């Protein structure tokens, strides 16, 4: 039977509930337990697919094509377990399901209400499909006190009563701010947050307290007294240098032991922390460093590229180097010469994105990398812009563009309407709902045996995750290849270009998919490991 850990947050948002959940899951895994993590998001959107990156950050795509919260990326990276559509629910999906049931008559004429219908739908989501797991961790998005979160908090309160005794534990993540004028940490915000949570009917078993300095024993006793938790269950969560130090830090503070104790599991299997210690050692003891320019559209909010950032650091781990990121807004290159920005970097990465803004700047970045022989990694939109650059400057198609930017006589990049998914042909209407017109999830690609990318993968058959509406137009393939841009990877039916590369360039690869979504600290994605390796070689030339 699965045991449930419900993780809530208080005082302020962005405390790191997702990292906390992922770290705890990793610690339980290290003890040999089978763990699943689920995210409950209170917003009314059906999924984050159409939300602005500045509002939400990255949209993390799973193998089965779900557009989910970026925390699921942390879950995958920390546990190695691929997430799926059933690991993330939103208020929007809950209400959509309920309205569909009401229209079908499933409620037999009953008045549909938040309690019991909404809360029952949430509980069903939490409990479904957990037969193969020892622990299920449920992170509740938002902050205690948010009106949007009330149905979710009520649902997990009910579950605490309905589940067998001893199979549900509540962890509350809070903040102890330091007040310089007083020269001390303050417990009152945490006390009020717990009071709010208790007023809903949830009594936390464990307090995980964020702080930027050691919490005095007197403050721990104070929190224990006023929040009605054991003193040993007041766990300090101090700031650490990297997110991959969090599992080690939480283990030293006794979080995993306290959770197991709350479930009455004693003695518990000892954890194996060696691989986390190895990752931490490599991060803190690099043998060199490289600088990668990320020429993007949403550089004002780094969370928009969360998986990309982590994958680059994984590439650094594979090569035992520190990876420094130089963030460049692509629009800058539309009014300024790229050379002063790019001459000192050791690699250029143009990530995915949507829309015309910044496109010309990304094209200029691809041109600089091609002409100066600087390692270039184009992902999704970055591959498309590299193809447009080649069409303009190598093939001589001056009007080469993308139909995403408006009508064009030379659509080197165009809207997809159909593609193969396994043996089935999937179709999308261009006029359909914005959230349902993309190629989403894991798809197969076939690589040329003699290509550089096949050598990097060590295989000619790969499966990678996609999130795009537009694709390089195969009608331009022959002319681009004649000019030197090799279409090294194609969809199994040979219709959709998946990867491109230059044979005469040290490292210039574009991919239509998002390899960053499958990178792990213990298993760096081969493309990122190879890209950083090429950047190391470039660093010796700069």
UniProtKB/Swiss-Prot annotation:
Signal peptide extent: none
Superkingdom: Bacteria
Binding locations of CTP: 13, 146-148, 186-191, 222
Enzyme class, broadest EC rank: ligase
GO molecular function annotations of the record: ATP binding; CTP synthase activity; glutaminase activity; identical protein binding; metal ion binding
Summary of activators and inhibitors of this protein: Allosterically activated by GTP, when glutamine is the substrate; GTP has no effect on the reaction when ammonia is the substrate. The allosteric effector GTP functions by stabilizing the protein conformation that binds the tetrahedral intermediate(s) formed during glutamine hydrolysis. Inhibited by the product CTP, via allosteric rather than competitive inhibition.
Single biological process term from Gene Ontology: 'de novo' CTP biosynthetic process
GO CC annotation: cytosol
Catalytic activity entry: UTP + L-glutamine + ATP + H2O = CTP + L-glutamate + ADP + phosphate + 2 H(+); L-glutamine + H2O = L-glutamate + NH4(+); UTP + NH4(+) + ATP = CTP + ADP + phosphate + 2 H(+)
Binding locations of ATP: 14-19, 71
Positions of the UniProt region annotated as Amidoligase domain: 1-265
Coiled coil start-end: none
Function: Catalyzes the ATP-dependent amination of UTP to CTP with either L-glutamine or ammonia as the source of nitrogen. Regulates intracellular CTP levels through interactions with the four ribonucleotide triphosphates.
Family the entry assigns: Belongs to the CTP synthase family.
Protein name: CTP synthase
Source organism (scientific name): Brucella abortus (strain 2308)
Gene name as annotated: pyrG
């Amino acid at each position: 039977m699965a045991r449930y850990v419900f993780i809530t947050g208080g005082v302020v948002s962005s405390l790191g509930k997702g990292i906390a959940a992922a770290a705890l899951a990793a610690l339980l895994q290290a003890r040999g337990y089978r763990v699943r993590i689920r995210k409950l998001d209170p917003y009314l959107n059906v999924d984050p697919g159409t939300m602005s990156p500045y509002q939400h950050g990255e949209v993390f795509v799973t193998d089965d094509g779900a557009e989910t919260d970026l925390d699921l990326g942390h879950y995958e990276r920390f546990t190695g377990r691929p997430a799926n559509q059933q690991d993330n629910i939103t208020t929007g999906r809950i209400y959509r399901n309920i309205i569909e049931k009401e229209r079908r008559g499933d409620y037999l004429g009953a008045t549909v209400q938040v309690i019991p219908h909404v809360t029952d739908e949430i509980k069903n989501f939490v409990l479904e499909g957990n037969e193969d797991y020892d622990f299920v961790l449920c992170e509740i998005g938002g902050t205690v006190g948010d009106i949007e979160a009330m149905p979710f908090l009520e649902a997990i309160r009910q579950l605490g009563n309905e589940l067998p005794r001893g199979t549900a534990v509540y962890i509350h993540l809070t903040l102890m701010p330091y007040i310089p004028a007083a020269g001390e940490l303050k417990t009152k915000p945490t006390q009020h947050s717990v009071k709010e949570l208790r007023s809903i009917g949830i009594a936390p078993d464990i307090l995980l307290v964020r702080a930027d300095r050691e919490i005095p024993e007197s403050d721990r006793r104070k929190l224990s007294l006023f929040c009605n938790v054991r003193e040993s269950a007041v766990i300090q969560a101090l700031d650490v240098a990297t997110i991959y130090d969090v599992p080690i830090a939480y283990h030293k503070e006794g979080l995993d032991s306290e959770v197991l104790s709350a479930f009455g599991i004693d003695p518990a299997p000892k954890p194996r922390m060696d691989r986390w210690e190895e990752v931490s050692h490599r991060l803190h003891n690099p043998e060199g460093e490289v600088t990668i320019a990320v020429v993007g559209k949403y550089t004002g909010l780094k969370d928009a590229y969360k998986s990309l950032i982590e994958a680059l650091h994984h590439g650094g781990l594979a090569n035992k180097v520190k990876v420094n990121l130089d963030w460049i807004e692509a629009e800058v290159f539309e009014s300024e010469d790229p050379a002063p920005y790019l001459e000192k970097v050791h690699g250029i990465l143009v990530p995915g994105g949507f829309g015309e803004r910044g496109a010309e700047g990304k094209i200029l970045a691809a041109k600089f990398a091609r002409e100066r022989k600087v390692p270039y990694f184009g992902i999704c939109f970055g591959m498309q812009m590299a193809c447009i650059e080649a069409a303009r400057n190598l093939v001589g198609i001056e009007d080469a563009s993308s139909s995403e930017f408006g009508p064009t006589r030379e659509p080197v990049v165009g809207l997809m309407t159909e593609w193969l998914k396994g043996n089935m042909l999937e179709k999308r209407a261009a006029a359909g709902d914005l959230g349902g017109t993309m190629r989403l999830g894991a798809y197969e690609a076939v690589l040329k045996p003699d290509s550089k990318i096949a050598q990097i993968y060590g295989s000619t058959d790969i499966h990678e995750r996609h999130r795009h509406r537009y694709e390089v137009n195969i009608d331009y393939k022959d002319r681009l290849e004649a000019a030197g841009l090799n279409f090294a990877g194609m969809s199994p039916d040979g219709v959709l270009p998946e990867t491109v590369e230059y044979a005469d360039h040290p490292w210039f690869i574009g991919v239509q998919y998002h390899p960053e979504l499958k990178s792990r600290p213990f298993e760096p994605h081969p493309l990122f490991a190879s890209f950083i390796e090429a950047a190391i070689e470039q660093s010796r030339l700069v």
